[in-house]
Swiss-Prot record:
GO terms for cellular component: cytosolic large ribosomal subunit. GO terms for molecular function: mRNA binding; structural constituent of ribosome. Keywords: Ribonucleoprotein, Ribosomal protein. This is Large ribosomal subunit protein uL13. It comes from Lacticaseibacillus paracasei (strain ATCC 334 / BCRC 17002 / CCUG 31169 / CIP 107868 / KCTC 3260 / NRRL B-441). This protein is one of the early assembly proteins of the 50S ribosomal subunit, although it is not seen to bind rRNA by itself. It is important during the early stages of 50S assembly. Gene3D superfamilies: Ribosomal protein L13. NCBIfam families: rplM_bact (TIGR01066). The lineage of its organism: Bacteria, Bacillati, Bacillota, Bacilli, Lactobacillales. GO terms for biological process: negative regulation of translation; translation. Part of the 50S ribosomal subunit.
Amino acid sequence: MRTTFLAKPGEIERKWYVVDATDIPLGRLSSVVASILRGKNKPQFTPNVDTGDNVIIINASKLKLTGKKASDKIYYHHSQHPGGLKHEIAGDLLRDNPARLVEYSVKKMLPTKNTLGHQQFLKLHVYAGEEHPHLAQKPEVLDISNLI
């Protein structure tokens, strides 16, 4: 009788990937990146263990918002004080801080009710331009146009 394989945290080999976000829709980019951060692209995926890889997203300022999301999509957060409901419009975020827009989108696609989602989210690195400081890790370029 065979037993189910369960990955152990010490046995996991992590890779580094670079994804170019130029002209890719935000949701499609986020779903592929969230899957890689969770480790669902690996055969040794275990739901309760962080088996994912590190992902670097470059050119976040050049990604695409389809439809009327630039004006209609609103991100809400609260300061925990009375009357402290804040909001940010997706088009303004794309113009002012595109890295935060991508981080919001990917974070909502990861587990949120435990610390595992936070561990996976820490492996995401988003940059608005072409440059990134992770060349020492020798990241491999991941073309996600065939994955979406």
